[in-house]
Amino acid sequence: WIGTVLAFYFGKANFEAATQSYKDAIKTLTPEEKISRLAVKDVMLPVKDIVYLDLAEESDKPIPAILEYERFKPYNRFAVLDKNMVVKYMIHRGVFYQFLYNSFQSKETSTENQPKNVTLKDLLESNDEQFKKMLNRSVGFISISANLLDAKRVMDATEECFDVFVTQTGKNSEPILGLLTNNRIFQYAKV
């Protein structure tokens, strides 16, 4: 019976040592090692929780009205999706304000060009190269089977990218399944 007690005691000590070793190892993981262990599907904002603009329904809405939408008050980025839930644009609040300002400053200011009448469609169809560039950047795409480090790498490789959308295979022509923002990745990368 003494052997049984000693085996139990040392077995418990070994278990506690192993547990402590595991805890110490977790603490020493780098942020990249930590996020490489997290599946995108487990940490993304699911599509049902994404606040977005419906391209077909809202393209004729005045930009000032869009900026006043209650659902967007906490956000500085506006995802624009088509009827198939495919991302068309990610527009930063500042782009809207800059476009309104430019419309107001335009020498062709008329009743239609007054900022209160400028629509989302006007922005999307603008011939101004500055706005074309702003509308066609800053979004990445990744497969649902990827990990968070993969998402960070996509973000790092894309100029001024703050958002990575999750699709089935990572193609931008597919319906989105979720979203990872730079803030969300940073949150999970904290050690």
Task: Give the positions of each predicted feature.
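Glycine-rich acetyl-CoA-binding "A-motif" of GNAT/NAT acetyltransferases
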Residues: 86-90, 172-179
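HAD-like aspartate-dependent phosphatase fold
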Residues: 29, 106, 182-184
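The conserved cystathionine-beta-synthase
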Residues: 53-75, 80-82, 100, 122-128, ...
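Membrane-proximal soluble helical/coiled-coil segments
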Residues: 31-123
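Canonical hydrophobic alpha-helical transmembrane segment
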Residues: 1-6
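Membrane-proximal helical linkers
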Residues: 8-45
